[in-house]
Amino acid sequence: MNFSPNCNRAVSEQRGIDCITFLAENHEAFIAMIILITGASHTGKTVLAQRMLEKYRYPYLSIDHLKMGLIRSGNTDLTPENDDALTEYLWPIVREMVKTAVENKQNLIVEGCYIPFNWRQDFDEQYLAQIRFICLAMTEEYIESHFDEIISHESEVEVRLVEADCTIAGLTADNKRYIDGFRKAGEGERVVIIDGDYEEAIKI
């Protein structure tokens, strides 16, 4: 499994790229492989991770599960609403788990929104060679025309509370933040833009 390096054109043109574009045919050639999946809320990170688990038999770690375990156990006073603070708190833990998996030649999918834009600076080349990265993001047009459908799928893989404050404006701003943030960090070619057929966009 590998990721195609030439998807930046599609990102700049705001056209959707399906996830299979990122995947090479022979994933078995890799002894160890870490796949990082991030993106705005409701973009389908957990759905994609679950599908990769089923297809490639890679275990996956939900950063949301780690977050809630730490919050519920009283190990932090942060709340689920403290996004930036949670990224600062959770990422050092997650990155060391990733390093441990690479060192032990273990495959792992990590999914969640708490991956910083500059995540690469925390890994030496020996680790980066084994890490692949995807960010899922929706265009404003897609959100406006599919908002009810997006909300209806928010518990497709795992049960979660309906976000009463989730609005078109908020979702649009969140997705734009991810697109702009990862572009500025040099990750533009790794952003999967969802602006048409959702199933085609996240197909693996």
Can you annotate each of these PLM segments?
Residues 86-128:
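Glycine-rich phosphate-binding loop used to anchor ATP phosphates in small-molecule kinases
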Residues 130-177:
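A glycine- and Lys/Arg-enriched "phosphate-lid" helix/loop adjacent to the NTP-binding pocket
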Residues 50-93:
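Conserved substrate/cofactor phosphate-moiety recognition/catalytic segment
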Residues 44:
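Conserved glycine(s) of the Walker
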Residues 176-204:
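NTP-dependent small-molecule kinase module
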Residues 37:
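Hydrophobic anchor at the beta1->P-loop junction of P-loop NTPases
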Residues 41:
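The conserved Walker
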